[in-house]
Amino acid sequence: MINNFINKGILILFMSMTIVEVGAQELGKVWSNAVGVEERAVIESKGLAPVLARGIETPPPFTNLRAAAEWEEIEALTIAWEGFPCILKQIVSASISECRVIIFTENPSSTSNYLTGSSCGGALNLDNVDIIEQDLNTIWIRDYGANTVYGSWNDDRILVDWIYNRPRPDDDVVSDALGEYLGIDVYSTTAEPYDLMNTGGNFMSDGFGTAFESELVHNENSGGSNWWTTFPNHTPTEIEGIFETFMGIDTFITMPTLPYDGIHHIDMHMKLLDEETLLVSQYPSGTADGPQIEANIQSVLQNYTTKWGTPFKVHWITAPPQQGGGYPNSGRSESVV
């Protein structure tokens, strides 16, 4: 039995675009999670050539699919080495004693030298680190990385990859690179009638067939087009069917998007700590996204229960009422959060 899985990645919480220079390593533009005016101009000047077909585009041939939960034991933590090297090095340092670390980078020698150099905590032992050369657009691998699914509940591990909801073609194929490197089949929701656009920051699984999302998943799969793509066209029922067919999700909890949250990822304000516990941001009364968050959680409590048939436990944590603060996102590598 295989009881570990490949983490879909880690999100580093920086929302500004900047030039990063640390010691002798200088990195280029670091794009924010949402595509801004400057990045769009770069994309349009270079042209966009997405890889439309990739992975296995038919449903996994298993009858007991289970999408892994983030807190389960992991085999490896995946990192996109694209900006913020000092922080990424600290993440590697904290993780290498807990699990294997797989780093995607456009310059393996530079990344290796930085990890073994004296800056930001000193030299690291790379025995438990795999460095893979890979073209990248951004750091946000939590959003575009692969999802671990078991075909036979705890055996027959596969990776499931969606259409990424950003015009970043290099990022969108990282899951295929990971699958090839590890020898794991990658099933992709890239072909009709199973085409589905989604992002890791807007998906949480309890490991027992229940998933949480904002209604962004409906908005981005209801047809139409924008400046860079034509969206898949499905009803909410069809969307839920694709999640069940590829990932074994049989209870799909969606919540209205928030009025002030620009990217509408649920991990901006909540975290599923285990199969029965929610960590949720709490704003001052009547402030910002607080009322909608409270309404969403109340709806969850009124209409859904845990795997065990009990009410979800909710832990509220104080959130800043304005831009510039943090939110309860994290990545996990075994006991390290």
Locate the predicted segments by residue.
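Generic low-polarity alpha-helical segments
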Residues: M1, I19, G23, S335-V337
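The feature marks the mature, well-folded catalytic cores of soluble enzymes
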Residues: Q25-V337
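Bacterial N-terminal signal peptides that target proteins for export
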Residues: M1-I10
